[in-house]
């Protein structure tokens, strides 16, 4: 049994190709049912997100399994293989396992360390188990992959550093204020990044939001969304006295707030820090405000600089994460290789147990005077002998199982020397008459 993986992602395929291969939940369910009917695949999991579509499968012949998955993509998406084969990546064995673990640990994501991918993979696994397309091999793979991702999150700082403008703004605010629980936010203007920054601040328990906009109707709508208070642009200066964090994104041709505007409220603020996040281009906030005591202005370039430094930090943490991934690849491979020897070990155990039971019955029949205590002693003695006899063959099989080229020979030799292919083994074993 081996693991194969075939797929495409943001690194290998443009968005127009990726969107052709995306599976929604209904399509994924139908796709899994189709995968279950492919004889070359023993088990399968379909992973589909906005940035990747991949199929991990267990199969007896890796090359046949890979070809079957390529054909599945071509048939289900009605696209000739030659139109997309150059966009596919193909892994087998340890490389396939490593890829699954790296994806779950967010080492293969567009944004290194982003947390969403693990939840998406758990959902993919849930759909596969629901469709009954997984068994012992992929169940073990996915559980180990989730454990690996959890260790990466716990033992490294790969997700600790903000790598988006909105998160970087929150990170800076926390450095200035510490806890944000009593801090008030003033949003001037609108825009996706500014609104996301407000959402993140509220998620960190900021005390409330004032919303000012060029049109008061828009301010009312945004305030309702954030459960805040709408104000008119003319009221912004007055609210500088009570706000702690100013987020501005108006797109106005000149500064919305100048140094003189802030200087007017310094006495009323009693030296409390004021943090400005200027996401507008051209800028809304006069950079000269930085020269005022306890006033901090960060524009889009400053925030990007924070992100660049944080990406470097995540890259350093990724080195530690890769080590955790590689460690778990080895552990999974050891388990998978041992899987092939289990039937032989079970057959050997059944044969020896049948011999033990038969010889016990014959011997005890010749000593009818033996009491229950004596029977238990003989039971323990014979069981101990069987366990000791089994020890060396099991260790031999496990050692041989690590060498792929010798595995079949080792298993065949063991079955021959113990005559395990004899249909009279196990429960039907009959000892030779003396």
Curated annotation (Swiss-Prot):
Function per UniProt: Catalyzes the NADPH-dependent reduction of glutamyl-tRNA(Glu) to glutamate 1-semialdehyde (GSA).
Pfam families from the UniProt entry: GlutR_dimer, GlutR_N, Shikimate_DH
The species this protein was found in: Desulfatibacillum aliphaticivorans
Location of the active site: 50 (nucleophile)
Note: During catalysis, the active site Cys acts as a nucleophile attacking the alpha-carbonyl group of tRNA-bound glutamate with the formation of a thioester intermediate between enzyme and glutamate, and the concomitant release of tRNA(Glu). The thioester intermediate is finally reduced by direct hydride transfer from NADPH, to form the product GSA.
Top-rank taxon, per record: Bacteria
GO function term, MF aspect, one: NADP binding
PROSITE patterns from the UniProt entry: GLUTR
Leading EC class: oxidoreductase
Entry annotated with the keyword Transmembrane: no
Protein name in UniProt: Glutamyl-tRNA reductase
Catalytic activity: (S)-4-amino-5-oxopentanoate + tRNA(Glu) + NADP(+) = L-glutamyl-tRNA(Glu) + NADPH + H(+)
EC number(s) recorded for this UniProt protein: 1.2.1.70
Keywords linked to the UniProt accession: NADP, Oxidoreductase, Porphyrin biosynthesis
Binding residues for substrate: 49-52, 109, 114-116, 120
GO biological processes: protoporphyrinogen IX biosynthetic process from glutamate
Site-annotated residues for Important for activity: 99
Entry text on domains: Possesses an unusual extended V-shaped dimeric structure with each monomer consisting of three distinct domains arranged along a curved 'spinal' alpha-helix. The N-terminal catalytic domain specifically recognizes the glutamate moiety of the substrate. The second domain is the NADPH-binding domain, and the third C-terminal domain is responsible for dimerization.
Quaternary structure, from the entry: Homodimer.
UniProt binding sites for NADP(+): 189-194
Pathway in which the depicted protein is active: Porphyrin-containing compound metabolism; protoporphyrin-IX biosynthesis; 5-aminolevulinate from L-glutamyl-tRNA(Glu): step 1/2
The family this protein is said to belong to: Belongs to the glutamyl-tRNA reductase family.
């Amino acid at each position: 049994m081996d693991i194969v993986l075939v797929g495409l992602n943001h690194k290998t395929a443009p968005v127009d190709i990726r969107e052709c291969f995306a599976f929604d939940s209904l399509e994924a369910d139908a796709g899994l049912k189709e995968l279950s009917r492919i004889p070359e695949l023993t088990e399968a999991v379909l992973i589909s997100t906005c940035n990747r579509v991949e199929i991990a499968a267990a199969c007896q012949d890796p090359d046949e399994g890979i070809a079957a998955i390529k054909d599945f993509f071509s048939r289900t998406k009605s696209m000739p293989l030659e139109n997309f084969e150059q966009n596919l990546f193909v892994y087998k064995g340890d490389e396939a396992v490593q890829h699954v673990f790296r994806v779950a640990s967010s080492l293969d994501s567009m944004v290194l360390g982003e947390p969403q991918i693990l939840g998406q993979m758990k959902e993919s696994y849930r759909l596969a188990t629901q469709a009954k397309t997984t068994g012992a091999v992929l169940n073990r793979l996915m559980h180990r992959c989730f454990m690996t991702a959890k260790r990466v999150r716990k033992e490294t700082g790969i997700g600790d550093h903000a790598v988006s403008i909105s998160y970087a703004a929150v990170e800076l605010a926390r450095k200035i204020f510490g806890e944000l629980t009593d801090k008030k936010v003033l949003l001037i203007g609108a825009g996706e990044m500014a609104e996301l920054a407000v959402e993140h601040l509220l998620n960190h328990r900021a005390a409330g939001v004032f919303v000012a906009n060029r049109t008061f109707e828009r301010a009312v709508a945004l305030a309702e969304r954030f459960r805040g208070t709408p104000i008119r642009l003319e009221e912004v200066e007055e609210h500088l006295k009570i706000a702690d964090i100013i987020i501005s994104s108006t797109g106005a041709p000149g500064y919305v707030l100048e140094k003189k505007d802030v200087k007017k409220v310094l006495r009323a603020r009693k030296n409390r820090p004021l943090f400005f996040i200027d996401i507008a281009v051209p800028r809304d906030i006069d950079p000269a405000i930085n020269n005022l005591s306890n006033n901090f202005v960060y524009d889009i370039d400053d925030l990007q600089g924070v992100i660049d430094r944080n990406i470097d930090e995540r890259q350093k943490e990724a080195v530690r994460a890769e080590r955790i991934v590689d460690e778990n690849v080895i552990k999974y491979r050891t388990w998978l290789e041992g899987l092939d020897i289990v039937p032989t070990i079970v057959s050997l155990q059944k044969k020896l147990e049948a011999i033990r039971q038969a010889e016990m019955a014959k011997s005890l029949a010749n000593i009818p005077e033996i009491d229950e205590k004596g029977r238990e002693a003989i039971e323990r003695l014979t069981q101990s002998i069987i366990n000791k006899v089994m020890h060396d063959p099991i260790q031999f099989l496990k050692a041989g199982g690590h060498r792929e080229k010798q595995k079949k020979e080792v298993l065949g030799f063991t079955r021959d020397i113990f005559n395990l292919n004899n249909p009279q083994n196990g429960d039907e074993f009959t000892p030779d008459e003396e």
